[in-house]
């Protein structure tokens, strides 16, 4: 089962993903893509860590997501990735278009092949106005294209608003 959970900042998407992982009854590997570039992000990361059960395996991978998924995925394991848009940001800031393209394609290729349960969390960025800056516009565009491609490969897609899951594809939660 592959789940994509979308939502805005502080929408409850991570809590929902963590709940689904815990309820799966499987061993959980939590793949964190965030990097603590400043104090505020460091506090967010600490908040997420504090919420996770101690027995969950945590891996921090800001760039090579597909390789990490391939190495961790197995029947009887749940992989929770939080989050795709931070991973995308990390790749955009690498300023290496070939790396971005390669990592994105590797992720899309491996999703259909992975055994076990996969839960992907991402920020929906396309509901606001078109950003003024070139990099910001590219980020919103890349996130939108990535979400479409991943949603196509997932059995269930859920949009989270105010802590409430709204089904977009597949069985409602």
UniProtKB/Swiss-Prot annotation:
Annotated TM spans: none
E.C. number(s) listed in UniProt: 2.7.1.156, 2.7.7.62
Amino acids binding GTP: 7-14, 32-34, 49-52, 60, 82
Tagged with keyword Aminoacyl-tRNA synthetase? no
Q: Does the keyword Glycoprotein apply?
A: no
Pfam families in the cross-refs: CobU
Going by the UniProt record, its keywords in alphabetical order are:
ATP-binding, Cobalamin biosynthesis, GTP-binding, Kinase, Nucleotide-binding, Transferase
Q: Which Gene3D superfamilies match?
A: P-loop containing nucleotide triphosphate hydrolases
* Residue positions of the active site: 48 (gmp-histidine intermediate)
Q: Which SUPFAM superfamilies match?
A: P-loop containing nucleoside triphosphate hydrolases (SSF52540)
| Top-level taxon of origin | Bacteria
Instruction: Please give the pathway this protein is involved in.
Output: Cofactor biosynthesis; adenosylcobalamin biosynthesis; adenosylcobalamin from cob(II)yrinate a,c-diamide: step 5/7; Cofactor biosynthesis; adenosylcobalamin biosynthesis; adenosylcobalamin from cob(II)yrinate a,c-diamide: step 6/7
InterPro entries from the entry? Answer: CobU/CobP, P-loop_NTPase
- Reaction(s) catalysed (UniProt annotation): adenosylcob(III)inamide + GTP = adenosylcob(III)inamide phosphate + GDP + H(+); adenosylcob(III)inamide + ATP = adenosylcob(III)inamide phosphate + ADP + H(+); adenosylcob(III)inamide phosphate + GTP + H(+) = adenosylcob(III)inamide-GDP + diphosphate
Instruction: Give any single GO term for biological process.
Output: cobalamin biosynthetic process
Q: Which family does it belong to?
A: Belongs to the CobU/CobP family.
UniProt cross-references to PANTHER family, sorted A to Z:
BIFUNCTIONAL ADENOSYLCOBALAMIN BIOSYNTHESIS PROTEIN COBU (PTHR34848:SF1), PTHR34848
User: What functional role does this protein have?
Assistant: Catalyzes ATP-dependent phosphorylation of adenosylcobinamide and addition of GMP to adenosylcobinamide phosphate.
What's the name of the protein? Bifunctional adenosylcobalamin biosynthesis protein CobP
Q: What is the lineage of its organism?
A: Bacteria, Pseudomonadati, Pseudomonadota, Gammaproteobacteria, Pseudomonadales
Gene name of the encoded protein:
cobP
């Amino acid at each position: 089962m592959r789940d994509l959970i979308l939502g805005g900042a502080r929408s409850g998407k991570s809590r929902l993903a963590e709940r689904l992982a815990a309820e799966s009854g499987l061993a959980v590997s939590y793949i964190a893509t965030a990097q603590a570039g400043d104090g505020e992000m460091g506090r967010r990361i600490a908040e997420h860590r504090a919420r996770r059960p101690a027995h969950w395996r945590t891996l921090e991978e800001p760039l090579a997501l597909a390789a990490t998924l391939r190495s961790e995925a197995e029947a009887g394991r749940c992989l929770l990735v939080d989050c795709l848009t931070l991973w995308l940001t990390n790749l955009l800031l690498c300023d290496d278009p070939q790396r971005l393209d390669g990592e994105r394609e590797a992720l899309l290729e491996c999703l259909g092949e992975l055994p076990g349960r996969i839960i992907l969390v991402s920020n929906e960025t396309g509901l606001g106005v078109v950003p003024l800056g070139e990099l910001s516009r590219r980020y919103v565009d890349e996130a939108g294209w990535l979400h479409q491609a991943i949603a196509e490969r997932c059995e269930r897609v859920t949009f989270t608003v105010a802590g409430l899951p709204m089904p977009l594809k597949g069985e409602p939660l």
